[in-house]
């Protein structure tokens, strides 16, 4: 499973209520007419991510797809047909944005994460050792490990999503970001939230 992760933030003069309403309308339109391979979407609001709004208030959308082919279909579908007007209405009030591509490496999707831990692989550590060390820590909180693909995106290489605080990540010097559910899985297609 892949996730297109899109960070975005509102224009100063736009109210949070209006901005989130437009975003919800787009997610709903995408869910009502999903492209092939689209598994669902969710979004959280956050602060302190240096790659989003300079660390200010921002949103982080997760668009889940089966594979790279489905990612291409999502790219086309997001701005066409019944999704075009809601997409454009949401985009016109955004002050900026950045995107990244992540693959689910371990665990299951956490549809309503409360905590995100962003980090890079420690120097000298092999990937197999990193995954072996992360697995029991992440399993304990029923979390998910996402790994950036093809160095696409401004954020760090790994993200651990969890519904509860995660201990045992000190070695990774993770940037810990508290999350707030901005809108639930409006575009869900059979994936149960954790």
For each feature predicted by the language model, list its residue ranges.
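Macromolecular interaction modules
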Residues: 1-194
